[in-house]
C-alpha cells in the first residue's frame, strides 16, 4: 500500500515537497486555503539570487528534478546600485547574478510552474480547502502575518528590462527601495 502524505500549503515549498514525494511514489495531497497557488501575490516581482554560489541555481534546480523552463525568469548580470549619497554604481557579473520571476496566478508565474510540476508528478491539489495542522505531515502554509509593509506601483513603460536597488533613508528609512522593469511592466 502506498503511503499517503498530506501537505498544508500550495506555495513554492509545499509544491516542491509534493513534486519530490510524488516522484518517489507517495500518494501526495496538498491543501490550500486560497483558490490557486500564488493567489496571495498580485503579479509581484521577486529576485532569485545566483551570486553566492559557483553553481548556477537553475542548474541546481535541474539536479533536484525541477524544470526552470516551466516559468518565466529574466536574468540580470548588472544592476544600478544607488548609494545613500545618490551615487550610482553598476556592479556586474559574467553569469546571471539573479533572475527576476513573477509571483501569482498567471501561467508564466513561478507559482504556476511549480503547480504544473507537482501535478505532472502525480500530486493532488485541493484548493479552497482547510485542513487542520495536526492532520498534515508537512506544514508549508507560509506566513500568518506580514513582517514588513511594502508600497508599490505597477506601471507600463517602453523602458528596457532594468533593475535599480536604492539604499537611501530619504525614500525608505532603515530599509531599501527598488525598481524592476520586465517586458514593459514596472
Question: What feature does the model see in each segment?
Answer:
Residues 10, 20, 34, 108, ...:
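Predominantly flavin-linked oxidoreductase catalytic cores and closely associated redox partners
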Residues 52-55, 93-116, 146:
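Short beta-strand to alpha-helix junction loop
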Residues 35-84:
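N-terminal FAD cofactor-binding segment of flavoenzymes
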Residues 87-96, 166:
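Short amphipathic beta-strand/extended segments with alternating polar/hydrophobic composition
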Residues 14-15:
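N-terminal Rossmann-fold NAD(P) dinucleotide-binding loop
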Residues 1-6:
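Extreme N-terminal starter segment of soluble prokaryotic enzymes
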Residues 8-10, 22-44:
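Glycine-rich FAD pyrophosphate-binding loop
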Residues 82-87, 182-185:
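Short acidic-glycine loop/turn motifs at beta-strand connectors
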